[in-house]
Amino acid sequence: MKYVDGFVVAVPAENKEAYIAMAAKAAPLFKEFGALRVVECWADDVPDGKLTDFRMAVKAQDHEEVVFSWIEFPSKEVRDAANQKMMSDPRMKE
């Protein structure tokens, strides 16, 4: 069964380019270590909810945007190994 790591994060709007650069750097490494797919989605049309929504989930402030992303792996074992490799790979420290 496939395994997915999902993320919802608040990113200051002025840091959008830096976030995109970081994501573009990390995605090929995740794929090298076994990820099938890496998806990054910068919020465009995220309406405010009444009970909950993406902005409330991450306590986004007015100057922040929501990013929804996920990494798909063939299994949890591959995901666990990939995360270990990512944490120790010197390219992630550059």
Provide a role label for each language-model segment.
Residues 1-68, 72-92:
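Short S/T/G/P-rich N-terminal loop/turn motif that feeds into the first structured element of a domain
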